[in-house]
Amino acid sequence: SHKDKVTVSVLDASSSSASALKFARYLNAPEKGSAVFTEMKFEAIEGDEWAEKPVLVLYSGGVNRPAVSETLEEFAIREGVAVETVFNGCGVLCAAMQAMNDTSNPRFPDAYYACDLCFVPPVEESFPEAVLLTETVIGIAVPKGNPKNIRTLADLGGPELKVGINNAQQSTLGFMTAGMLKQSALEKAVRGNVRAEVPTADLLINQIRTGSLDAVVVYEVNYKLAEEYLDFIRIDHEGARAVQPFAVRVDSPRRLLGQRLLAFMQKNRARFEASGFTWIENQRPVKSSELEIPPWLIQPKKQ
C-alpha cells in the first residue's frame, strides 16, 4: 500500500531558522509531537529525544579542526543547538570512549569524526557505519629550501638529524607513522633520531618553525598552515594517506541531529578543500566492519 510522508521544510532564507527547526524537532520528538501523531493514527517516524536546546557531543581528530571550526559554529547558530567538540589525537579519543564503556554517559560522543579509518574499528559497536568525507597525504615537512636534502622516509635515519613525530598511542598520525616505519624496516634507524614525540601535528609544526627540529612527519594539511616557511616531501608508501570518516552513534538520542550535521558539512566542501583536504566523491555510508584497513594498522576491538 502507498504511504505519503508528512514533512516539514525550513527555508534556507529563514531569518528565524533556529525557532523553526526547534518547532520541527518538537513535532518529531517521541514524547511530544510524535505521540500526538500516533494517537491520530499516523505512523510516527522516530525523532530525537526532546530538548529545548540539544547539546551534540562531537569527538574529532585534531587534523580536522581548521576545516570544520567555522562550519560547526554556523551549524549551531542555524539549528539553535550547542555543539560541544573535543579535538584530540584519535588514540586519546578512542581510549576515552573505551574507558567510559557506556553510551548512557552524557559525555559519550553522539558523533565521531576520525583522522583515519583505522581508528573506527576499535569503537565500531557504537559507530557501525561511517561516511568517508576527505583525505590527506602524509609527508615530511622541512625548513624552506630543504637544507638537509631530505627526499625519503629512509633519509630520516641519516646522521645527526633531529626528527619530530607524533605519539603512536595518542594519535592517528603517530600510529600510521609507526606502521610505515615498521613496514619499511626503518623503525630502529629513524627512532634513534627522534627528538620530539607529541600528541598532535600542530605542535610539530611549531617546533620545526622555531628551528629545534630538522624534519617532522605531518599531514599535508598541517604543512599548508605554514607553507610559506616550510617545504613538504610526500612519502612514497601505500600507507602515506589518511582518510577522514564521519560516524553518528547508533544509539544516540540526537542521531538525526548528528546526521544533519554531516549533511551541513557535506554542503561546505569548499572549506575542506581550502584547508588542503581532498574531497571524496563517493560518500555512500560504509559498514565500519567492512572498512579496508592495511594489515599493519589493524587494532584490537573494544572489549
Give the role of each language-model region:
Residues 1-86, 91-108, 114-126, 131-136, ...:
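Exported/periplasmic ABC-transporter solute-binding proteins
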